[in-house]
């Protein structure tokens, strides 16, 4: 009988440690193996096994002396390439005869012919190196090279194969533009080199001709020396004809390329810009330029060409920069740097950005509110809307220092990156992004603004009798009043204008405590449909309703427009027929105070995103997100300030320190609707009294508090327009504005937010503002809530609008934001981005409260 020790001896050692196996557990063959952890390993990207850290652009050449070699990388940081073998990869991408171009003596031709072959585009991959590349082959011309050609290629190298394949069309388009720019500069340099070589050959021919004549005179016509000189002269003559034919070919290239579709597209994509220095030229300057050009052309000294040239491997080949014109070469590098930045990052991010741009381009009706304007938007705007007739034309490239045979040589690539001119509709207003101070007020021109008038036709006050003025003083109170600023006359006299048609209901008296200027009357030609809706002789003690074709939800909406005519001056107005209260008003108060404009020279300013002549970028707005995040955490009344900006109420930031004021402006400008490409609706620093037209133009103003006569006038303007603006005193940490009760802005600006990065908070703001814009778009174009059922029943329109906004989930205060955005969308839809129509100036008869920390 076998005992227990023998049984134990025949058992396996592992059987004693077996635990119970769960039958419901996942089998091993279906389990995912763990990722092998390494120092810089990333399981979510294919660059983990590549020898370079991020994508880059490689420019290589197939040199006839040393073979394929890398020339430069973009970016030029050696850390980007890492241990990646550039020489090996250059050999891979340059080892194929990709174009099979023929340059030599074709059949039936005595001279070499330049074949302008098209670029080739291929995709190569090296799984061993973990690199995939989009390769763009091109040919440049060099007079000293074999066959006059120098093969080059530009490659976008990435570790993500899907990025190369899915973005092939975009890469091909961008690299084609860079290649065309590089080849245009090369053709220009090649033509210059041909001209110089022709001068050398002609000089050599003249020298050889003289020497040949001397040999004939001394040794006879059949001497050895004379025969050698004659053969050498014949070779020079042949070379001259060949170089002239090459020059003819290279200069006739653009005329053929202009018929190509790609060339036309490349030419059309250039913005119509022109250097400001080219506008104002006089005959003397042009004469000097002509003399200078002629001196440059004659500055080259011809050289004698030796009979035997250097060997192929003894001569020095030109570098890529020497093969091209300097300006074209630098422009090509800028384009390639832009390509590298645009395709940088993950494929998902690039694809999402492209979808975003495509969607934004289709939503131009609302994208102007909070989205950054792009170059393609400018191009679209220039096609859809009118362009000023005085725009300068695009200058043709002037190749100074070139022979006369190159005068017809043109190209589709502009030489310089010229800054866009500050034109109407294209750039910022004259004073929108520049700082306005009173430092050089004595040298500035004085501007005198008139009072408010109607936008209709104007004639003298004699058509209105004084009795009708006094009797019907309160008659014809309309639910909406239109105010316009008359244009400046030569004598700068102010006027009160009267409408064309006489009516008993065209004169409205405004309460001195709540009228726009507290200084005059508003004359309006009443509408026919409202002729029977005039009020009685009662004092205005309640807020008026809105006009029929206006927005009834807005309590009062004034439209400021420029009138081409001037009305009656104050000297012609008989104030005895007016009421006693109006007669006591100082006449000087009717005139807007003179503004003195100058460029501030203060050097101790804080960093501001507003730079004159440059567009605001998304990067600057992301930086402003950090300032906005800090603002809502430091100021408890941040929601009230943001509510004023979103509802169209001008916010004035008052302070002594310019740096503090600019920081607050920088924190709040991302909440301003219709900011503009250049920040036209924001004035970061103002040291003069602002006017009513400034409130119409600027929605965020940084105002200087100064202890001076200018400071007292600034405080006077604040008190004068205090009912129509909100004032944030950064010195006393107070805010005077109407109250806000709602939940929309509490989600937008919550001081308890867990967001810590400014860029993240900017994306949060952008998302919520986009949602708000979508609701405003829906409110604007839902026609059934704006069209009245009956012309006499306007209450139904107001109730339908109110119910519609309530269904969207907005309170009364939040509805004001939707209505203001809706008005901006209407104006943009009618007038376009050219901003032909003036924006509306709206305010509410509500009480302002003082908020303190």
Swiss-Prot record:
**Region annotation Disordered: where it falls in the sequence:** 272-298, 418-454
Could you tell me where the Low complexity compositional bias lies?
Answer: 421-432
Protein's GO biological process? autophagy
Keyword Cytoplasm assigned to the entry: answer is yes
Q: Which GO terms describe its cellular component?
A: cytoplasm; guanyl-nucleotide exchange factor complex; nucleus
What GO MF terms are annotated? GTPase activator activity; guanyl-nucleotide exchange factor activity
Instruction: List where in the cell it is found.
Output: Cytoplasm; Nucleus
**Database matches in Pfam families:** Folliculin
- Keyword set includes Disulfide bond: no
Compositional bias (Polar residues) spans? 280-298, 433-454
Per UniProt, which keywords does this protein have? Answer: Autophagy, Cytoplasm, Guanine-nucleotide releasing factor, Nucleus
**Family matches, as PROSITE patterns:** DENN_FLCN_SMCR8
In what residue span(s) does the uDENN FLCN/SMCR8-type domain sit?
Answer: 47-219
**Highest taxon in the source lineage:** Eukaryota
Main localization category: cytoplasm
Q: Which residues form the cDENN FLCN/SMCR8-type domain?
A: 316-753
Domain annotation dDENN FLCN/SMCR8-type: ranges: 762-826
| Free-text function comment from the UniProt entry | Component of the C9orf72-SMCR8 complex, a complex that has guanine nucleotide exchange factor (GEF) activity and regulates autophagy. In the complex, C9orf72 and SMCR8 probably constitute the catalytic subunits that promote the exchange of GDP to GTP, converting inactive GDP-bound RAB8A and RAB39B into their active GTP-bound form, thereby promoting autophagosome maturation. The C9orf72-SMCR8 complex also acts as a negative regulator of autophagy initiation by interacting with the ATG1/ULK1 kinase complex and inhibiting its protein kinase activity.
Record text on subunit structure and interactions = Component of the C9orf72-SMCR8 complex. The C9orf72-SMCR8 complex associates with the ATG1/ULK1 kinase complex.
Family membership, please give it: Belongs to the SMCR8 family.
Protein name, per record:
Guanine nucleotide exchange protein smcr8a
